[in-house]
Amino acid sequence: SNGYVVGVDVDQNYIGVNGVADGSFAYNPFITSAMKGLTEAVNTALSDIEAGDWSDIAASNGNFGLEDGDYVGLPTDADSWNFETFTTDEYEALKEKIKSGEIAVDNSSDDSTKPTVSEFTTVNYIQ
């Protein structure tokens, strides 16, 4: 009880808002959502196909991040921004540092780079 979650794929704030409105939730548990830029990814793939570059993307897995474009992100609309001490301006500045390469994000899926977790993982809440 009284937990919080991060939605995935699309802005899921509406689930919490609707849950509060209909009485399912006592509060909105969604802090934010880790969104995929599906529109951007599809447009990029279609542009590659239109340009005749199908062989570059056929039978492959795409791995799109901020360094490549707006392929991932957080919802920044005022009604979805639920952070109390992290502003949208700070978020946009952080995104720019990732895009420019000033901050590097490890995109590896190698087991040696994955964090070790178990059912005994401790989560520290910062208020």
Question: Where are these predicted regions, by residue range?
Answer:
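A residue-level marker of the well-folded mature domains of exported/periplasmic proteins
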Residues: 1-127
